[in-house]
UniProtKB/Swiss-Prot annotation:
Its main location: plastid. Component of the chloroplast large ribosomal subunit (LSU). Mature 70S chloroplast ribosomes of higher plants consist of a small (30S) and a large (50S) subunit. The 30S small subunit contains 1 molecule of ribosomal RNA (16S rRNA) and 24 different proteins. The 50S large subunit contains 3 rRNA molecules (23S, 5S and 4.5S rRNA) and 33 different proteins. Disulfide bonds: none annotated. PANTHER family: 60S RIBOSOMAL PROTEIN L11-RELATED. SUPFAM superfamilies: RL5-like (SSF55282). Component of the chloroplast ribosome (chloro-ribosome), a dedicated translation machinery responsible for the synthesis of chloroplast genome-encoded proteins, including proteins of the transcription and translation machinery and components of the photosynthetic apparatus. This is Large ribosomal subunit protein uL5c. GO terms for cellular component: chloroplast; ribonucleoprotein complex; ribosome. It comes from Spinacia oleracea (Spinach).
Length: 258
């Protein structure tokens, strides 16, 4: 087995590269990975478990938000506490079938924003009025889960939304009644990964945040604790249809209102 000094001298020219080596002390364990970092001509070996960073939003949720939500809504089991399970980002591209370069540019931009390569969304049926054929590419979409989801949500709340032009808070009534929230963007340049000077065309996108909350009130509280800047002086409200007054009803047989 090579000594540590030999490994250090060998890896000095491969800064930032992750190596895999099999140790003789534990042959059944398998591969043990470490990260090499160069600083002033020296190499520092870091274990893989120590090199992995934990997202701050996920850490705050586990350590601070879960106890607050459990106490406020009187959950008997910690598994009842609502959480974000996935985020779906959709981007519609009307001229995708005629402009292949525009489609590739949109895919690259959404991949930079989300950290995951999107998939193409295609038409399921043909609509002659909109010149849409079955199987035609209409847009792209990304489904985020796990650490990528928390990282994207953190950047969306703290970087993208404040950079929106004339931003006064997101609409608190954009819940779907089942604890899921949607927010839209008119242009992708609000994300810091996209440079406005190199963007060829402004493209909007829709972000749907799916949670395990049973009600909009629970989801509203969850996202508020995460830092979602809801519009002040308002909260989630359910649509209530107004009953028609009797004076609005007209009896055709009698020819009068009642």
């Amino acid at each position: 087995m090579a000594s540590t000094s030999l490994l250090q001298s060998t890896s000095s020219s491969f800064a930032g590269v992750r190596f895999h080596c099999r140790t003789s002390a534990a042959p059944r364990v398998g591969l043990s990975s470490f990260t090499v970092k160069a600083a002033a001509g020296t190499a520092v070996f870091v274990d893989k478990a120590e090199a992995e960073t934990i997202n701050r939003l996920k850490t705050n949720y586990i350590e601070k938000m879960v106890p607050l939500l459990k106490e406020e809504f009187s959950y008997s089991n910690i598994l009842e506490v609502p959480k974000v399970v996935k985020i779906v980002v959709n981007c519609g591209i009307g001229d995708a079938s005629q402009n292949a370069k525009g489609l590739d540019a949109a895919i690259n931009e959404l991949a930079l924003i989300t950290g995951q390569r999107p998939v193409k969304t295609k038409a399921k049926t043909s609509i002659a009025g909109f010149k849409v054929r079955e199987g035609m590419t209409l847009g792209i979409a990304v489904t985020l889960r796990g650490n990528l989801m928390y990282s994207f949500l953190d950047r969306l709340i703290n970087l993208a939304l404040p950079r929106t032009r004339d931003f006064q808070g997101v609409n608190p009534n954009s819940f779907d009644g089942h604890g899921n929230y949607s927010v839209g963007f008119r242009e992708q340049s609000v994300f810091p990964e996209i440079k406005p000077e190199i963007v060829g065309k402004a493209r909007g996108m829709d972000v749907c945040i799916t949670t395990t909350a049973k009600t909009d009130k629970e989801a509203y509280k969850l996202l508020s604790l995460m830092g979602m800047p809801f519009r002040e002086g308002s909260g989630p409200s359910t649509l209530v249809r107004k009953k028609k007054l009797k004076s609005h009803h007209f009896d055709a047989k009698k020819g009068r209102r009642y």
